[in-house]
């Protein structure tokens, strides 16, 4: 895999608060190699290490995108949801930003059935068929459609399990991460000072609570994916 330059700037990361970790009492000792200091009761992440692993992650997603691979971005907590949707739409990736339904990947046949139902209901709504049903039936199906849109709207075009999964918060998305591990799907994970860096294929030491930090990391990954997709289009 060729290494590239991704314009990862330490000062920019500091301004975004990427280096701020959790309180020193809430930490995972496995993160010790990625922590540079303690300040006012919180751990400070070593941004040189962050830059290194973020660059590796960008190389990985560029290479995968240049070969037409598919990505899933997962981040369901309120601080991450908007950034996840924005990043996924920009890079034409699938995403989950409301709630991870258990078995979404490991029980793909069930997810696929739900997606077929979702597409059918969307088509019925688009063609006006729902409005021609009895009011009670129409209301029930519209509620079902709304629920499916909330939980599956970001993966409505997904036809199989993704090739790479990007996870914003390891603790919040632990179920998703375990499913990826079970299926052998490579993962890239924002890893705060209370996380286990060994669980992901590439762990990016970073603040996973600040919107500015989440957005900066996703922005770099999205740029690399878009560059890779452009390469794939030019050289199919």
UniProtKB/Swiss-Prot annotation:
InterPro entries in alphabetical order: Ribosomal_uS2, Ribosomal_uS2_bac/mit/plastid, Ribosomal_uS2_CS, Ribosomal_uS2_flav_dom_sf
Protein origin, superkingdom: Eukaryota
Recorded GO CC terms: chloroplast; small ribosomal subunit
Principal cellular location given in the protein's record: plastid
CDD domains: RPS2 (cd01425)
Keywords from the named record: Chloroplast, Plastid, Ribonucleoprotein, Ribosomal protein
BP terms from Gene Ontology: translation
Stored Gene3D superfamilies: Glucose-6-phosphate isomerase like protein, domain 1 (3.40.50.10490), Helix hairpin bin (1.10.287.610)
Record carries keyword Nucleotidyltransferase: no
Subcellular location per the Swiss-Prot or TrEMBL entry: Plastid, Chloroplast
Pfam families registered for this protein in UniProt: Ribosomal_S2
Gene Ontology MF term list: structural constituent of ribosome
Alphabetical list of NCBIfam families matching this protein: rpsB_bact
UniProt similarity note: Belongs to the universal ribosomal protein uS2 family.
Name the record gives this protein: Small ribosomal subunit protein uS2c
Organism listed in the record: Nicotiana tabacum (Common tobacco)
């Amino acid at each position: 895999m060729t290494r590239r330059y991704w314009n990862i700037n330490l000062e920019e990361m500091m301004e975004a608060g990427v280096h701020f970790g959790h309180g020193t009492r809430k930490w995972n000792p496995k993160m010790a190699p990625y922590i540079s200091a303690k300040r006012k009761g919180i751990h400070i992440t070593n941004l040189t290490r962050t830059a290194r692993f973020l660059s590796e992650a960008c190389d990985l997603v560029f290479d995968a995108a240049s070969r037409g691979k598919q990505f899933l971005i997962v981040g369901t907590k309120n601080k991450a949801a908007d950034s996840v949707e924005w990043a996924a739409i920009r890079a034409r990736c699938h995403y989950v930003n409301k709630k991870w339904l258990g078995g979404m990947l490991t029980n793909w046949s069930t997810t696929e059935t739900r997606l077929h139902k979702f597409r059918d209901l969307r088509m019925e709504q688009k063609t006006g068929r729902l409005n021609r049903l009895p009011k009670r039936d129409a209301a029930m199906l519209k509620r079902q459609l709304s629920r499916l849109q909330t939980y599956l709207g970001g993966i409505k075009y997904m036809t199989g399990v993704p090739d790479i999964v990007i996870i914003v918060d390891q603790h919040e998305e632990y179920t998703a991460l375990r499913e990826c591990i079970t299926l052998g799907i490579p993962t890239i994970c924002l890893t705060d000072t209370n996380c286990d860096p060994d669980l992901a294929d590439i762990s990016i030491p970073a603040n996973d609570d600040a919107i500015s930090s989440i957005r900066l990391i996703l922005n770099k990954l999205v740029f690399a994916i878009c560059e890779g997709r452009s390469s794939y289009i030019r050289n199919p």
